[in-house]
Amino acid sequence: MFWESELNAPLLWCLVETESCSTPRTRLPTTALGSCGERTAVQEPDWASVTLGVFVCQACSLLHRGIPHISRVKSVQQETWDASEVELMAAMGNEPAKAKYEQKVPAFYYRPKHTDCKLLREQWIRARYERNEFEFIEKQEPYSAGYREGFLWKRGRDNGQFLSRKFILSEREGALKYFNKQDARDPKAVMKIETLNATFQPAKIGNPYGLQITYLRDNSTRNIFVYHSDSKEMVDWFNAIRAARFHYLQVAFPGASDEELVPKLTRSFMKEGFMEKTGPKHTEGFKKRWFTMDDRRLMYFKDPLDAYARGEVFIGSKENSYTVLPGLPTSTQGYHWNHGITIVTPDRKFLFACETEAEQRDWIAAFQRVINRPMRPQEYAVEAHFKHKP
């Protein structure tokens, strides 16, 4: 992933002559944006691909080293350069490289940020420079065809074992389905594209290619955890889901622009982690639970990899009497962690406790972001039909 100057002015080159080499240097704006989304306050990036002619950030330089037949990385300041390498950097540069290697990126294709998992960042690099997927549209067929079929390792709902399962994604049927047996005629589950979401969770699943798929079943969230041994296959599945969502939303919202639809294709969870909770009477003992904040849905699980939440709480806006407060009511007892949070809703209060003050701050900030955001019309319908499991 390369540095992209946001200025229209050409890059300023100077050659620093030493006894054995010429070293290229470039002056960028004080905050430069890389294609991985990273901003930095340094003016002189330290790494470059001398075969592609682009500057790369340090994290992405490590990924470029994984494709040495395509990209050879050098330090700008600490390694020797020959004249041909300097000439290539001067002739190419980041903007021309972007115009060449990203000329036909589909609107739905996920462009990773520097905070995304290694899998997404690596496959983004390989898709551009190794497979040239965005120069030749026919190479995008695995995730652009509207239909995808294959096998993924799926975690069992009850036994926790990963078993090979057949998956079919069909835009025509508006669903992602999976089958317990290879020759089964009826699917075990049908996940409507309308409520489908996918997010990579390598640490949580315990696999570098682990993907968490969620969908609504009877207005409750169902989790499915899958992976594939091939990294490209897994990212192709992810982008195929995004393509299906994109085309569904284009029909559902015909007047919306691509820029409006793309943020709605898939989403990462706002916050996850363990907290303690008590029951609706506030006299029950506090129990440790895994919490997931998925937009306005706060879900809690006994185990992070549970298929279903033990309960779900809708978090509305401050205009609708939702509030987050630090601490717990003075009469509260039975908690083990000392950093409390109180969520006030129109119906009741929810009491949580965090292990550390830092976790408390992070959770409060996540709740506050949602509460400060006005509710959209469709969210009122979600609130009205929301099911809370006590």
Regions found by a protein language model. Give the residues of each.
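Cys/His-rich Zn2+-binding "zinc-finger" mini-domains, especially FYVE domains
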Residues: 1-78
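Cys/His-rich, Zn2+-coordinating zinc-finger modules
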Residues: 2-3, 7-8, 58-142
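Cys/His-rich zinc-coordinating "finger" modules and their low-complexity flanking regions
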Residues: 1-18, 122, 126, 145, ...
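Pleckstrin homology
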Residues: 2, 127-145, 227-264, 268, ...
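Polybasic phosphoinositide-binding surfaces of eukaryotic membrane-targeting domains
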Residues: 147-191, 237, 267-316, 350, ...
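Conserved beta-strand elements of beta-rich interaction domains across eukaryotes
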Residues: 26-29, 42-45, 54-55, 61-62, ...
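Eukaryotic intrinsically disordered and solvent-exposed regulatory patches
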Residues: 5-9, 26-32, 41-45, 85, ...
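Disordered regulatory linkers adjacent to lipid/PI-binding modules
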Residues: 145-147, 246-308, 314-315, 319-338, ...
